[in-house]
């Protein structure tokens, strides 16, 4: 049953990421999505459906890895530092 919850959440998260990426240019959309997902993970401390599933499907490590492969090192640094800071901020809101 846990796998079903994660799979359902991942599908919903991926659809949400796709919809947002249609509204905003790709690199900026990806950064915003990853920052938002990190913040929500820290703030809500979600269960399997919403954490591992939805937020795992919503955020994108593969697109981040592709940008790294293409040499976007500043973008990668901003993403890593920004996502850690967003998670810490969300965690502070949860406390």
UniProtKB/Swiss-Prot annotation:
GO terms under cellular component: plasma membrane
Topology of this chain in the membrane: Multi-pass membrane protein
Compartments where found: Cell membrane
UniProt main location, coarse: membrane
Key words of the record: Cell membrane, Ion channel, Ion transport, Membrane, Metal-binding, Sodium, Transmembrane, Transmembrane helix, Transport
Catalysis performed (reactions): fluoride(in) = fluoride(out)
Residues the record lists as binding Na(+): 56, 59
Transmembrane segments: 23-43, 49-69, 70-90
Regulation: Na(+) is not transported, but it plays an essential structural role and its presence is essential for fluoride channel function.
Biological process terms in GO annotation: cellular detoxification of fluoride
Ligase among keywords: no
Keyword match Membrane: yes
Database matches in Pfam families: CRCB
GO MF terms held by the record: fluoride channel activity; metal ion binding
Entry-linked NCBIfam families: PRK00134.1 (NF001101)
Family the UniProt entry places it in: Belongs to the fluoride channel Fluc/FEX (TC 1.A.43) family.
Protein's job: Fluoride-specific ion channel. Important for reducing fluoride concentration in the cell, thus reducing its toxicity.
Protein name: Fluoride-specific ion channel FluC 1
Organism: Corynebacterium diphtheriae (strain ATCC 700971 / NCTC 13129 / Biotype gravis)
């Amino acid at each position: 049953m846990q796998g079903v919850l994660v799979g359902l959440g991942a599908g919903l998260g991926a659809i949400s990421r796709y919809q947002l990426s249609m509204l905003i240019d790709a690199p900026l959309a990806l950064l915003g999505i990853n920052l938002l997902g990190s913040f929500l993970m820290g703030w809500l401390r979600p269960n399997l459906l919403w954490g591992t599933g939805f937020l795992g499907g919503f955020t994108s490590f593969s697109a981040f890895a592709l940008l790294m492969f293409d040499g976007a090192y500043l973008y990668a640094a901003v993403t890593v530092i920004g996502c850690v800071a967003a998670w810490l901020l969300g965690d502070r809101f949860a406390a």
